[in-house]
Structures are given as C-alpha cells and as structure tokens.
Amino acid sequence: MELRVGNKYRLGRKIGSGSFGDIYLGANIASGEEVAIKLECVKTKHPQLHIESKFYKMMQGGVGIPSIKWCGAEGDYNVMVMELLGPSLEDLFNFCSRKFSLKTVLLLADQMISRIEYIHSKNFIHRDVKPDNFLMGLGKKGNLVYIIDFGLAKKYRDARTHQHIPYRENKNLTGTARYASINTHLGIEQSRRDDLESLGYVLMYFNLGSLPWQGLKAATKRQKYERISEKKMSTPIEVLCKGYPSEFSTYLNFCRSLRFDDKPDYSYLRQLFRNLFHRQGFSYDYVFDWNMLKFGAARNPEDVDRERREHEREERMGQLRGSATRALPPGPPTGATANRLRSAAEPVASTPASRIQQTGNTSPRAISRADRERKVSMRLHRGAPANVSSSDLTGRQEVSRLAASQTSVPFDHLGK
C-alpha cells in the first residue's frame, strides 16, 4: 500500500529522527524527484514543525537555504516537505578520518560565513553553529554548503526599525557547549558575534581534529559544562591556533572584540581567508577532501571550471533564488500510523541506501570505522542522503534534560 502526503508525494522509508518528529525519504509522484518529509504528530505536547517551517520560509531565497516544497496536515500528522540534501560536515569529517586539509577548511569557511551573514540579514541569529548543522547539496549542487536547523534561532532585531534586542545577563541559554562562545558560557544574551565565534571553533575543530575542551570528565553534565567553560576561557586563542596560519587567531580575536550589538564585518572575515587561500596557491576548483577519497584522482579541468562558474552564479543570485533541504527519518509507518495517511493501490517503491550512523562528535557506537566509511562512500557515489542529526528537530522549549557537550539542546546557565 502506497502512503501519500498532500496527494502529491510518496512517503518512503524512515531516514532519521529527532526529539519532536521523524524524517522520511519521499518522492514527488509526478516527477520522481526525491524529497525529505518531516512528520510530527499533531497531538505532540510541544508542536515545533509549524514554527520550524515558518523559519525556513522566512529564509527562502538565499543560497544554501533548504527550500520548502509543501507544508500542511495529513491525518494525525503535521507535515513539511523539503528538498533533499546530502551528508553533514560532521559526517564528512568522520569520513575523512576526522581531519580536513587547510584547503578544504578555507573553502568551507568562505561559504559558512556567507550562510551566517544571510541569516543575520534576515534579522535572526542561529545560536547553534556546529558541523552537524551544515550539509552539502546533492548532484549539481554537491559543492554547495547548506545551513539547517532553526530550532534554536532567535530574532535579534526588529525587521522594520532594526532596533537590536537589549543586552541581558544571567540567561538560561541554548546551544552546543563544545562550540559555544565565551559570552554564551557566561550567560550573556547571544547576538551576531556569538554565531561567528562559534564558527571559529568549528574551523579549528576541522583543523585540529578535536578541541582542547573535548573529553573532559565530570561527575555530572552540569559540572562538565563548567569544565568546558573554564578550559575554553583559560586557553589563549594563540595557543588554540598554534601551528596554523595566523588568520584563524585573527578571526577569533576579531569575533571576541565585537560589542553586543555590533554588526560584524563579514566581508573582512571572508577576505582574511580568501587572501590566505591565494597565498597558499590553492585553486577554487571546489575539490574537497571527500571528493579526493571519492574519485581518487583529479577531475576533468572543464568540469572544474564549469562547477566554479555555476557556484559563482549561485552566489550572485542568492538574494533572488531559493535552493535545496536535508534528509529526514527508518521505514514507513505501519499499522495505525499507516491508516492515518492516505493510501493508494500501487506498491511502495523501494528506496536506496542503508543508513549512515549519526556520530555526533564521537566515534559511532554501533558500527566500525571501516563500516561507517564504506556507508558514507556509498552515499557519495550514489548521491544518496545522509541520515539527519538529532539536532534537526531540536525544539526551542526549555526542556529539563541536560545533554552531552556536542548535543544542541537548551542548557542552563551555570553561573546563576
């Protein structure tokens, strides 16, 4: 029995899940185009899908912003259909043995700064900048970095007057402790500067393989957050970035020097890394480390040049166009769940790909490194989506649980 959504999309197998819903592979019945379909039970205690869809709709038109194809209710479910995306940068980082080359880090930095700038231009801060929340596109957009998960996003200024939110302290804060800014740890209201500081830690994570405040032991998670905060504040930027080009320490020092309501100079930060890129003699061929593992050889120069031109055109037209989305959750619903959705007489088409184990920022529990790399490699070759990270459906509620340092859930300000 075929399960349909909006009488337009075929519901396939579950490919991910989150705190507030499940994500399925789907397909447009007419065109066959694969999509991601998020389902949330309408009876859930804290409905989030409608809020999330509103954020995505507000962001539509920017390069690297997943496009929304359909939203509505189907039986007992709230539904959001999005364009399908590939693996997250965390997936790819693990695939590349948890180390990126300088070239790959700089290629990513350029796009990631632009994604954050775009969100800020729409009057929101993301508040959960981490590798899991950046995904690569699929097919022709395989070299484009997308930003996802607005579950923790917040409006930082009025859309009409641009009046900035007031400075506050002693906040119960949300975010991911590993990449949180120092001001976030101190309980200060987040603003644009904090998204960019978090990105600085992400870039050094890609350079180093891990950050000095990873793996800290503590009796409770609350104490672990305190230790992360202490270690982060006691590690000078120059020590963190030692052995790497000075641009990385310059970037972090710049972010930390910003005042609460300052508008960051995004162009300056991009240019820092672009100048370094050119001095290193790198080429904007968009060959990332995982491409080398995928193909094992250099690509045709004509293909490289064509992709470069397409990427530049996408960036120029970013304010006028929308783009893609990420994969959603294993196996279609059965029994009572299936009966709540419309059905048709045709058989369910089989869907590709075994799941990629979501590793967060630690080695996978259930599969070996070799098995994980084999599965990611299969997806890279076949253009299949990666499994979504659990943070994709993270809610904005002040939930009571305290998560591990790499998990994006609200965490209490420890200094209160």
Curated annotation (Swiss-Prot):
Phosphorylation leads to a decrease in the catalytic activity. Its main location: cytoplasm. It is an enzyme of class 2 (transferase). The active site is at residue 128. Autophosphorylated. Partially dephosphorylated by PPP5C. May be dephosphorylated by PP1. Induction: Down-regulated during granulocytic differentiation. Does not show circadian oscillations. The modification Phosphoserine is found at residues 343, 354, 363, 389, 405, 408. The modification Phosphothreonine is found at residue 362. Residues 351-365 have a biased composition (Polar residues). The modification Omega-N-methylarginine is found at residue 382. This is Casein kinase I isoform epsilon. The lineage of its organism: Eukaryota, Metazoa, Chordata, Craniata, Vertebrata.
